[in-house]
Swiss-Prot record:
Protein name, UniProt field: Phospholipid scramblase 4
Top-level taxon in the UniProt lineage: Eukaryota
UniProt keyword terms in alphabetical order: Calcium, Cell membrane, Lipoprotein, Membrane, Nucleus, Palmitate, Phosphoprotein, Repeat, SH3-binding, Transmembrane, Transmembrane helix
A molecular-function term among this protein's GO annotations: CD4 receptor binding
Domain topic, free-text comment: The N-terminal proline-rich domain (PRD) is required for phospholipid scramblase activity.
Needed co-factor(s): Ca(2+); Mg(2+); Zn(2+)
Amino acid sequence: MSGVVPTAPEQPAGEMENQTKPPDPRPDAPPEYNSHFLPGPPGTAVPPPTGYPGGLPMGYYSPQQPSTFPLYQPVGGIHPVRYQPGKYPMPNQSVPITWMPGPTPMANCPPGLEYLVQLDNIHVLQHFEPLEMMTCFETNNRYDIKNNSDQMVYIVTEDTDDFTRNAYRTLRPFVLRVTDCMGREIMTMQRPFRCTCCCFCCPSARQELEVQCPPGVTIGFVAEHWNLCRAVYSIQNEKKENVMRVRGPCSTYGCGSDSVFEVKSLDGISNIGSIIRKWNGLLSAMADADHFDIHFPLDLDVKMKAMIFGACFLIDFMYFERSPPQRSR
């Protein structure tokens, strides 16, 4: 009896395996959801869709459910979301342009000029060109046309070749193309070349601008009149009959003040509107980034509004366009 060693009671084989098997460090697999995860702050609990016994966790939405956040695909691994959609623009993303709502077509109105029917003043903002500041290379002018609500009405772009721009500078002939929110060219302004080296008072040397709306159909002209003291222009119809006059200040190079060009009737008594070149401080003195305010009556004929609008660009090229060599002196 003394030589017999007591033994423990025998246990089933299954219990022995459970005791000797080391614990699995991997957690159980998460439950499978037939849904898409959306980044961003968790929203309110979404009621369960038809066919699901219970609600889904916060931040999960079924594919059939509309959500307020777009779906994003992870790029280059898992990274935190630094920009919430709709909050701030992403890096290298241009700011969207707010356009003026497009009006309905009107009878007896050239297509594209319906915007001017609703306005009594517009702002002409020239783009700042850093290349012209750093070099002597003249670039094509670009302008943004906006209303009082800072909504874009038109975009004006110069279409002149490099040789003509840099050879003739401010005296260059040019073509300005006016486009709307759909990118359609609704107006064209052309300035022919005029030689002013022989006699500035000669009729053949006077500047002229032709306005076409739609392109190819002339609606009027802006013609310069020689005057010893001030800038004087005539706004003419398609038959070159004088309709209005534009009278500028005695000095258009006033520093620290606005330059006002008054639009008057032919007899000079009635004041119809104005073209004001705004003084923008050092930016006006050093760069070609002019700002014009154009005012006209709300009930003025839309073609005459377009002619006053066109006169603004002829004034800009003749008196406020600074070539790079002149600015460096």
